[in-house]
Amino acid sequence: MAVPKKKKSKSKRNHRHAVWKGKAALAAQKAISLGKSVLTGKAQGFVYPIDEEEESEE
């Protein structure tokens, strides 16, 4: 005979949700930081190909 599972508490549900939201917020913060550093030209971990036209303009 089918028996329903025990209900998990709201506290556990909220804790799992908070952990998930925290990880998402951290990933979003890293993405924003990386985007800002790329836009300002301060990114050290990227190598950009330089076109010949850009070299002649400078």
From Swiss-Prot:
Keyword Ribonucleoprotein found: yes
Annotated InterPro entries: Ribosomal_bL32 (IPR002677), Ribosomal_bL32_plant/cyanobact (IPR044958), Ribosomal_zn-bd (IPR011332)
Keyword Chaperone carried by entry: no
GO cellular component: large ribosomal subunit
Coiled coil spans: none
UniProt keywords, alphabetically: Ribonucleoprotein, Ribosomal protein
PANTHER family, per database record: 50S RIBOSOMAL PROTEIN L32, CHLOROPLASTIC, LARGE RIBOSOMAL SUBUNIT PROTEIN BL32C
Alphabetized HAMAP family for the sequence: Ribosomal_bL32
Family the UniProt entry places it in: Belongs to the bacterial ribosomal protein bL32 family.
Name of the protein in its database record: Large ribosomal subunit protein bL32
Species of provenance: Prochlorococcus marinus (strain MIT 9515)
